[in-house]
Amino acid sequence: MGIRVYKPTTNGRRNMTSLDFAEITTSTPEKSLLVALKSKAGRNNNGRITVRHQGGGHKRFYRLVDFKRNKDNVEAVVKTIEYDPNRSANIALVHYTDGVKAYIIAPKGLEVGQRIVSGPEADIKVGNALPLANIPVGTLIHNIELKPGRGGELVRAAGASAQVLGSEGKYVLVRLQSGEVRMILGTCRATVGVVGNEQHGLVNLGKAGRSRWKGIRPTVRGSVMNPNDHPHGGGEGKAPVGRKAPSTPWGKPALGLKTRNKKAKSDKLIVRRRNEK
């Protein structure tokens, strides 16, 4: 998918880019795979903001995407490649030979008419899903499970991929997009290939309004707030932070403080951290 560059006919158009959507084959989603999506605007069940900078935006339907890929040995044909407003990757509508329809994340190179299949005996071909233990070393994969049968949780964003490095007993070594090397059970499934729509990260929104269409509200600096709104607020003019270190709006240290639980059980499965050289 290419990048479309606009002429600077207005201030909002200057530097604006967008995807050309050349891979998209239809603009009409499969109705049976849509569910209503209520806008939460970052609020929890008490009506309190739990995630800042969310609200507004275009109304969306949620597409039911199959992350489990557990329909073994039943072939499916790719019918369409579609835009999904709820994620950075595109999705593909597949029709199984037994009549079932499903959405999957569209990997790079997947085309309409292509046949895909899931299961331990599946070929190492883009779009096929199989257990990690059955995937050869060096293969690029995405949509990786962390627990067998729970569905893919890792490597689902546009352009993302992980690589199989080897095996160690019942575990398989996988290098993630961040550089972290992690052991994952060999019975966990993954899909072969790189997630498509890899140009997504190169898009320049160009104006504030496009962020609002996406449901993203402005991010205001703490230093321009009042003291009752943020620890950095108050003072005359451009005042410094006034504390030992920068703080979050709730008074906790920001910038550099490690937030990972030191007793996390999954530590033993991480062979190399993402920030290790």
Swiss-Prot record:
SUPFAM superfamilies: Nucleic acid-binding proteins, Translation proteins SH3-like domain. InterPro entries: NA-bd_OB-fold, Rib_uL2_dom2, Ribosomal_uL2, Ribosomal_uL2_bac/org-type, Ribosomal_uL2_C, Ribosomal_uL2_CS, Ribosomal_uL2_dom3, Ribosomal_uL2_RNA-bd_dom. Belongs to the universal ribosomal protein uL2 family. One of the primary rRNA binding proteins. Required for association of the 30S and 50S subunits to form the 70S ribosome, for tRNA binding and peptide bond formation. It has been suggested to have peptidyltransferase activity; this is somewhat controversial. Makes several contacts with the 16S rRNA in the 70S ribosome. Gene3D superfamilies: 2.30.30.30, Nucleic acid-binding proteins, Ribosomal protein L2, domain 3. NCBIfam families: rplB_bact. The gene is rplB. The lineage of its organism: Bacteria, Bacillati, Bacillota, Bacilli, Lactobacillales. The keyword RNA-binding applies. This is Large ribosomal subunit protein uL2. Residues 219-277 are annotated as: Disordered. Pfam families: Ribosomal_L2, Ribosomal_L2_C. One of its GO terms (biological process) is cytoplasmic translation.
